[in-house]
Structure formats: C-alpha cells, structure tokens
A protein has these predicted regions:
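N-terminal targeting signals for export/organelle localization
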Residues: 2, 19-78
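C-terminal cap of thioredoxin/glutaredoxin-like
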Residues: 5-6, 25-41, 61, 180-249
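Bacterial N-terminal signal peptides
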Residues: 7-18
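Ser/Thr-centric signal marking residues that sit
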Residues: 11, 98, 220
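Solvent-exposed, acidic/flexible segments
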Residues: 29-33, 37, 44, 48-51, ...
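A short beta-strand-turn-helix
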Residues: 79-97, 121
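Structural alpha/beta surface segment adjacent to cysteine/selenocysteine redox centers
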Residues: 100, 105, 111-183, 188, ...
C-alpha cells in the first residue's frame, strides 16, 4: 500500500514540475488543479483497491477512537458502573475481574448467553458479576426488571436463583409467571410486589438507562469485562478469553 502511495506521489510530482518552476509555496491555479484531478481520477480507476484499503483504514481508526472514548467514559463512570448498591452482584464480591452485563429479560440474545454465564460462574470462582437491568422491550421487560431489582433489595441471597429462572423463562413474562417463579425461588410474592412499587426501584432502572446511554449502549446484551466493552451475545470461549485478557493487564 505504501508503494502505491509513493508511486502516486512521484507521478504527481513529475506531473506538476512543468507547472511549478519555483519552490515557493503558492496555491495551485485552475489548470494545475484540473490536471491533479484528472491524474487522481485516472489513477484511482486503475487501482480501485486503494479506496477499499482507505475505507478499511478509516473504519479501523474510527473503531479505535470509539473504543478509546468509551474506555475514558468507563473510567469516569467507574463508581456508577460497578458500585451502585441497587445493582445486583454475584460471584466473588472481591473478585480479581469484574464482568458487567446489561440485559433485558425478554431479550432472546440475552437468554442465549445464559448457559455460558452459568458455566463461567461454576468454573471460575474469582469473577465478580454485576447485573445491569436495562429493560428496552416494553412493559413486560420493565415489570421483570422491577421484580429482579426488588428481589435483590429484599433478599439478595435469593436473587441469583430468581434471576436465572426469570432469564430462562420460555413463556411470556406476566405478573403471574413472575410471582410463580418468585415462589419457587423462596421469595414472598407479597413482599416482592410491595418492593417493586418502591420508588427506588424505578430510580435504579432510570440510572441504568442513563448509564447505558452515556456508554452508547443501544441494545442488549452488552458486556464490560475489565476495561473491554463487548456489544452483543458472546459464547463461553469468548468470555473465557476476555477474562484471561483482563487478568493479564
């Protein structure tokens, strides 16, 4: 690629010699500009792959810039991301790596990641898991998010089982299905329902939405592992790799 640009530069220089008798930095006149435009046009037609390479380089540059910007935001929002008391936490509370998931209980991709997360929890006891409720898919998602956060509020030791059951639900999320899962996981439906109405629950959901917006998270699932942001569903192998990379930093 450099050779091509060098060839283009040499060709341009040679073409401009008749028009540039002095080394003074003077603006191109109309005739010179036209000559350059024709030269570039003809060269790019003969070597269109240069445009593809330039587009790829631009995309890579923008991706790297976005990643760097998000990392700065993560550093600035560290406390809000990792240490909100209303946010459920599982695994080793003093773990050497923190894995944060933004999720919606109705999200099919979130459900598809559940087995990988369950396996990771079983095989690696040094991870701190942070669960960020971001209901995006309508009233049922909001209802489920309230239930999850309320379970954490009234019985944190029973949250994880309830969360897994709710995420693994194959049928539609309704108030009846949510309360039935609560009963099965040792939660008092009345206490849960009362806690769901607590204004602090909706406030926590609003904070999560604001946080997701700040981090430019527009869909679920999304993960933050250490300092790495990962949008979309990931498999167990990818999660293991991300954890290993976070530990290696």
């Amino acid at each position: 690629m450099r050779a091509r640009y060098l060839a283009l530069a040499v060709t341009l220089a040679a073409a401009l010699l008749p028009f540039r008798p002095s080394a003074a930095a003077e603006p191109f006149d109309a005739e010179q500009k036209k000559a350059i435009e024709i030269l570039l046009h003809d060269y790019l037609l003969a070597h269109p792959e240069i445009l593809e390479e330039a587009i790829r380089a631009l995309q890579a540059k923008r991706t790297a810039e976005a990643a760097a910007q998000r990392e700065k935001k993560l550093a600035a929002l560290h406390k809000e991301v990792e240490d909100d008391p209303a946010t459920p936490v599982a695994g080793d509370l003093n773990g050497d790596v923190t894995l944060i998931q933004f999720f919606d209980y109705q999200c099919g991709y979130c459900k598809s990641v559940l087995p990988a997360l369950q396996q990771l929890m079983q095989e690696d006891r040094r991870i701190r898991f942070v669960m960020k409720e971001v209901p995006l898919l309508g009233p049922a998602s909001v209802h489920a998010a309230r239930a999850g956060l309320a379970a954490w509020k009234i019985a944190p030791e029973k949250y994880l089982g309830f969360h897994m059951a709710l995420m693994g639900l194959k049928t539609a999320i309704t108030d009846d299905s949510v309360m039935e899962l609560a009963r099965r996981n040792g939660l008092d439906p009345k206490r849960l329902r009362d806690a769901m109405a607590d204004p602090t629950i909706d406030a926590a959901i609003q904070r999560n939405h604001a946080l997701a917006e700040s981090l430019e998270i527009t869909g679920t699932p999304a993960f933050i592992v250490g300092k790495t942001f990962v949008p979309g569903a990931v498999d167990l192998a990818a999660l293991r790799k991300l954890i290993a990379e976070a530990r290696g930093r």
